[in-house]
Amino acid sequence: MHSLPIEPTVVASLRAELARGALTAPVALELMRESYRNYVRHNTQSFRMLFSHLLEDRAPLVIHCTAGKDRTGFASALILHALGVPEEVIAEDYLLTNRHYKRDLSSVSDLPADVLDAIGSVNASYLDAAFDAVGRDYGDVETYLRDGLKLGAAERTALKKRYLQA
């Protein structure tokens, strides 16, 4: 079992806004986008380790996080990018979460429905925010894969051989 620490800072931010009485759907949406940007800014090392495990391990790997949609969603998008999947397919795959994810928000049922929707589902703008951060920090996804995640041509070929069917 591998643990890759990626701390979800969004929870503390949401609680702070709630305590100030300022938690609205637009605020929640922006906090979610900022959380995704921070995956790139502060957690590239953890995502690099994920790819290390994908390349080294022989057993199947399960990738998950608390809700199974945000950190896992970004990790899955990175894996698909590394495998050469077209961006529009990656975006469609990410948004399938909203169709198949059964969220349990009973612990935060006192929040307005639009805020619950913002934090309990995925939004294309969340993934866009992460890849905008990739663009700002690395120029493009290919450079992020190569320089940030240390996936050169040999590693990408090995991933494709291991995880794609002919």
Located regions from the model:
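Cys-dependent protein tyrosine phosphatase-like superfamily
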Residues: 1-62, 74-166
